[in-house]
Curated annotation (Swiss-Prot):
<dbReference type="GO" id="GO:0006974">
    <property type="term" value="P:DNA damage response"/>
</dbReference>
<keyword id="KW-0007">Acetylation</keyword>
<keyword id="KW-0853">WD repeat</keyword>
<comment type="subunit">
    <text>Non-catalytic component of the METTL1-WDR4 complex, composed of METTL1 and WDR4. Interacts with FEN1; the interaction is direct.</text>
</comment>
<dbReference type="GO" id="GO:0043527">
    <property type="term" value="C:tRNA methyltransferase complex"/>
</dbReference>
<dbReference type="GO" id="GO:0005694">
    <property type="term" value="C:chromosome"/>
</dbReference>
<keyword id="KW-0819">tRNA processing</keyword>
<dbReference type="Pfam" id="PF00400">
    <property type="entry name" value="WD40"/>
</dbReference>
<dbReference type="InterPro" id="IPR036322">
    <property type="entry name" value="WD40_repeat_dom_sf"/>
</dbReference>
<dbReference type="GO" id="GO:0005829">
    <property type="term" value="C:cytosol"/>
</dbReference>
<comment type="function">
    <text>Non-catalytic component of the METTL1-WDR4 methyltransferase complex required for the formation of N(7)-methylguanine in a subset of RNA species, such as tRNAs, mRNAs and microRNAs (miRNAs). In the METTL1-WDR4 methyltransferase complex, WDR4 acts as a scaffold for tRNA-binding. Required for the formation of N(7)-methylguanine at position 46 (m7G46) in a large subset of tRNAs that contain the 5'-RAGGU-3' motif within the variable loop. M7G46 interacts with C13-G22 in the D-loop to stabilize tRNA tertiary structure and protect tRNAs from decay.</text>
</comment>
<keyword id="KW-0158">Chromosome</keyword>
<comment type="pathway">
    <text>tRNA modification; N(7)-methylguanine-tRNA biosynthesis.</text>
</comment>
<feature type="modified residue" description="N-acetylalanine">
    <location>
        <position position="2"/>
    </location>
</feature>
<feature type="repeat" description="WD 4">
    <location>
        <begin position="187"/>
        <end position="227"/>
    </location>
</feature>
<dbReference type="GO" id="GO:0106004">
    <property type="term" value="P:tRNA (guanine-N7)-methylation"/>
</dbReference>
<feature type="repeat" description="WD 1">
    <location>
        <begin position="60"/>
        <end position="99"/>
    </location>
</feature>
């Protein structure tokens, strides 16, 4: 899957990634003008043992970052790239701790709540765990699906591992015994693009899909609590209103029980309120932008940061004012962070025409009745054409009339 630009926030730490590079800085003025840049193309690579007929290594990656995330406390940051590497960082101060190899290209990753392990989901449907405490240790196979995994999450108490796949399923497995399945959350009609366990309501799960819905679940029982079609919230006059899309990011603000969604490069961000008591999602606002939105993330107590495809204003900060989310006035911190991104804009230039790779995951529609009627019409046309070729040519006075056998004999004797 291709990867567009990404944004991650934890505490005051902010990371922007694009191509093979990541840029880490701080949103706090007290941290000074801190800046950390890492390029995966400069990281160590495992020697390629498999070679093609020409003797050259095969299956070389482009070092593009495919997924990344912070640990719960923000002490660690991890990324994976399409050269099949898992790169772990310490964030205070920023330092690369290890570069490890994964079996297959990864689609999603997460830390356990204890921050002792990293769970990595890959394209073949497997989840591997890697130790944080032993940063150079190898991976361990934990569980597997029969189809591609698109996201992985853990419950806040580390008891359950939740996985989302291409075949519309969300599986809830026991972390201590992943072969033991607690439940399935079934209801989506397309691939499940993102899942998110609500941290301050740990029994609840949010999920999104290629079916353009956001759903709320009680995941241990597999019970769907609420379904919100995103297409019902957009204006039909928008140029992208008839486009099929999937949510590429679910981000959450615990302080206000607020959910924000960015959608596969569309110039919008959906805002919802989670009503945990009523077990429902309440649509609050649809933020629209002049440029495509790459990613969005909440900074607790500060607001919603939005990364967009605009070199002049790559980052926009929104805050709630009178019940509505509005663009915050430009501050010294915002100017400083945007300046860092502008200087390093080259890492984002290749992301301009790249989506999150969901377009190839939709089910192929098969209209059997249309195919049947088309083939039937072709068959009738062929039969008519065959009869036309077999019919005798018309005489000078029109088509020749067929004669009965008796008439033919009488005509011959006269």
């Amino acid at each position: 899957m291709a990867s567009s630009a990404g944004l991650a926030l934890c505490g005051h730490a902010l990371v922007v990634r694009g191509g093979s590079r990541l840029l880490a800085t701080s949103t706090s003025s007290s941290d000074g003008d801190s800046l950390f840049i890492y390029d995966c193309s400069a990281a160590e690579k495992k020697s390629q043992e498999n070679k093609g007929e020409d003797g050259q290594p095969v299956d070389q990656g482009s070092d593009t970052v495919l997924a990344s995330t912070f640990s719960k406390s923000g002490s660690y940051f991890v990324l994976t790239d399409d050269s099949k590497r898992l790169i772990l960082f310490r964030t205070n101060p920023w330092q690369c701790l290890s570069v490890r190899t994964v079996v297959r290209r990864c689609t999603a990753l997460t830390f356990t709540a204890s921050e002792e392990k990293i769970l990595v989901a890959d394209k073949s449907g497997d989840v591997y765990s890697f130790s944080v405490l032993e940063p150079h240790g190898g991976g361990r196979l934990e569980l597997g699906h029969l189809s591609m995994l698109l996201d992985v999450a853990v419950s806040p108490d580390d008891r359950f591992v939740l996985t989302a796949d291409r075949d519309e399923k969300i599986r809830v497995s026991w972390a201590a015994a992943p072969h033991s399945i607690e439940s399935f959350c079934l209801g989506h009609t397309e691939f499940v693009s993102r899942i998110f366990v609500v941290p301050n309501h740990p029994e609840l799960l949010l999920s999104s899909s290629g079916d353009c819905t956001l759903r709320l679940w009680e995941y241990r029982s597999g019970r769907e609590l609420h379904c919100c079609p995103l297409t019902s919230l957009q204006e039909p006059t928008e140029p992208w209103s008839d486009k099929r899309f999937a949510v590429s990011r679910i981000t959450y603000w615990s302080q206000e029980d607020c959910v924000a969604l960015s959608c596969d490069g569309l110039p919008v961000v959906y805002i919802f309120q989670l009503d945990a008591a009523q077990r429902q999602l309440v649509p609050r606002q649809l933020l629209t932008f002049q440029h495509r939105v790459w990613d969005a993330a909440f900074e607790e107590g500060h607001g919603l940061w939005v990364l967009q495809d605009c070199r002049e204003d790559p980052l926009v900060l929104y805050r709630p004012v009178g019940g509505q989310w509005q663009s915050a006035p430009e501050s010294a911190e915002l100017r400083r962070v945007c300046a860092h991104v502008r200087v390093n804009w080259a890492m984002l230039e290749g992301c301009a025409g790249v989506d999150s790779g969901f377009s190839s995951l939709y089910k192929a529609t098969c209209d059997n009745m249309t195919t049947y009627l088309k083939k039937k019409e072709e068959r009738l046309q062929q039969q008519l054409e065959k009869k036309r070729r077999q019919a005798p040519p018309p005489g000078p006075n029109g088509p020749t009339k067929k004669m009965r056998a008796g008439e033919l004999a009488q005509g011959c004797s006269s």
